[in-house]
């Protein structure tokens, strides 16, 4: 537009103070995204109208007046070009540079959000295509203006279902606390297979949601205490690695093991463990394991199970699967070999007698169970060549040990021990656990 600088009855009063460099900077910024120009102009105009800075009628009159002043025919295309230019100039005039950038990024986020939703809803979605679409969304600066709650909630549910857990009770809670960018951050610490989407399992799901709910509450109510509460450095191995391992080594018949008679479980499970021990992961997975071991360094770790059913609503599976502690000392190859053995042990525990009997007792035997893995640094203090974990425990939402009428069952119970958590789960004989009713903890 040649000049929209004078005031007058043609509707250009709001365009009279435009600083040319600001309008030019805005146009240069939005020109980087030519496919989004219509959406950006539409958003800009909506903002101007909502703030009472410009009406649609005023804009149309200003565009028509400028076309006539320049001696051009009032063709539809010409009017559209002038209208777009006047929107840009008005937006640059009335909004700060930071606001302009926020609204440009809002349009970009909406566009990438729609693409992410399209990929997630497709029947051929893979871990790679979803991750690429998610990363494109998260690469856009967060800014101070967000996509609508409805858009965000739909994408959150789809991502959580795709990557973490599809259980409806979990999704109903997690979608309120776990953001799209949170999921991206989790995946930055996830190992997986490109051909198998996989999920992170029930234990991982519970950890993620508990962290997102509890830490902000502590920060708001007791910041001094919150400083001492931290989630250990954590990595996830998705169930896609388990699926690839089963396919690669032709272990599909092991899925029928759960239908055998109880007397055959122990011998069969020992055979499965031996077969897992001699089996191999794909070279790509081993390469990911090696990078993880190098990243962790020489620090003790725990390899933890996270099956789809584990720690789900109404189903604890406490102590049913194997967790493996590793000293993780020495050269990389030795640590890698020990890590691979630990992962195999944890994966094989899905076929153990305890979880299968538990599933049978709860009517879950026909469920297509899968296993993911959580890898965490062991928390403790070093003393010479040793690492001493301070304390661990198991928390129950219902307290069945009410040794006093004052204790409220529904407030829960903590079984607290010194040292590693296995002492709380396995109830080691001769140990000294502390049973703490949460209704009366002191």
Describe each PLM feature range.
Residues 214-242:
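Glycine-rich phosphate/pyrophosphate-binding loops
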Residues 262-284:
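Metal-assisted phosphate- and nucleotidyl-transfer catalytic regions
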Residues 1-176, 182, 291, 300:
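N-terminal, non-catalytic alpha-helical interaction modules of very large eukaryotic scaffold proteins
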Residues 231-259, 263:
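Terminal amphipathic helices with adjacent charged low-complexity linkers/tails
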Residues 152-222, 276-442:
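Conserved mixed alpha/beta core segments that line enzyme active sites in large multi-domain catalysts
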Residues 37, 55, 68-71, 88-102, ...:
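Alpha-helix initiation/capping motif
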Residues 21-24, 38, 42, 76-84, ...:
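Non-catalytic, well-ordered alpha-helical scaffold segments
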């Amino acid at each position: 537009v040649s000049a929209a600088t004078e005031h007058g009855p043609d509707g250009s009063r709001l365009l009279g103070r435009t600083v040319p460099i600001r309008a030019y900077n805005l146009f240069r910024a939005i020109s980087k995204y030519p496919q989004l120009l219509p959406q950006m102009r539409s958003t800009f105009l909506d903002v101007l109208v909502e703030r009472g800075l410009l009406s649609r009628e005023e804009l149309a009159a200003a565009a028509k007046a400028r076309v006539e002043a320049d001696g051009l025919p009032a063709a539809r295309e010409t009017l559209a070009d002038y209208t777009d230019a006047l929107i840009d100039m008005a937006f640059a005039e009335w909004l700060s540079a930071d606001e302009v950038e926020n609204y440009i990024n809002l349009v970009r986020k909406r566009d990438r959000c729609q693409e992410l939703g399209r990929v997630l809803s497709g029947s051929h979605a893979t871990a790679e295509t979803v991750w690429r679409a998610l990363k494109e969304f998260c690469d856009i600066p967060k800014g101070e203006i967000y996509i609508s709650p409805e858009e965000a909630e739909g994408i959150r549910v789809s991502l959580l279902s795709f990557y973490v857990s599809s259980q409806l009770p979990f999704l109903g809670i997690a979608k309120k606390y776990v953001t799209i960018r949170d999921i991206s951050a989790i995946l930055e610490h996830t190992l997986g297979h490109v051909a198998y989407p996989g999920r992170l399992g029930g234990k991982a799901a519970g950890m993620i949601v508990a962290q997102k709910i509890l830490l902000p509450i502590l920060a708001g109510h007791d910041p001094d205490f919150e400083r001492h509460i931290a989630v250990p450095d954590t990595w996830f191995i998705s169930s896609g690695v388990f699926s690839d391992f089963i396919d690669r080594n032709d272990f599909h018949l092991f899925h029928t093991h759960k239908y055998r008679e109880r007397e055959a479980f122990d011998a069969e499970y020992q055979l499965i463990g031996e077969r897992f021990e001699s089996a191999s992961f794909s070279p790509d997975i081993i390469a990911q394991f090696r990078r993880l071991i190098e990243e962790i360094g020489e620090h003790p770790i725990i390899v933890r199970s996270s099956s789809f059913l584990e720690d789900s609503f109404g189903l604890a599976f406490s102590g049913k699967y194997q967790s493996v502690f590793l000293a993780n000392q020495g050269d990389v190859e030795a640590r890698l070999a020990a890590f691979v053995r630990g992962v195999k042990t944890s994966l094989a525990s899905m076929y153990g007698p305890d979880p299968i009997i538990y599933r049978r007792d709860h009517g879950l035997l026909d469920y297509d169970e899968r296993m993911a893995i959580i890898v965490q640094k062991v928390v403790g203090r070093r003393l010479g060549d040793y690492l001493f974990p301070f304390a661990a425990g198991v928390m129950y939402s219902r307290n069945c040990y009410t040794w006093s009428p004052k204790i409220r069952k529904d407030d829960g119970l903590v079984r607290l021990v010194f040292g590693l958590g296995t002492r709380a789960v396995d109830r080691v004989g001769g140990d000294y656990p502390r049973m703490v009713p949460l209704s009366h903890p002191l």
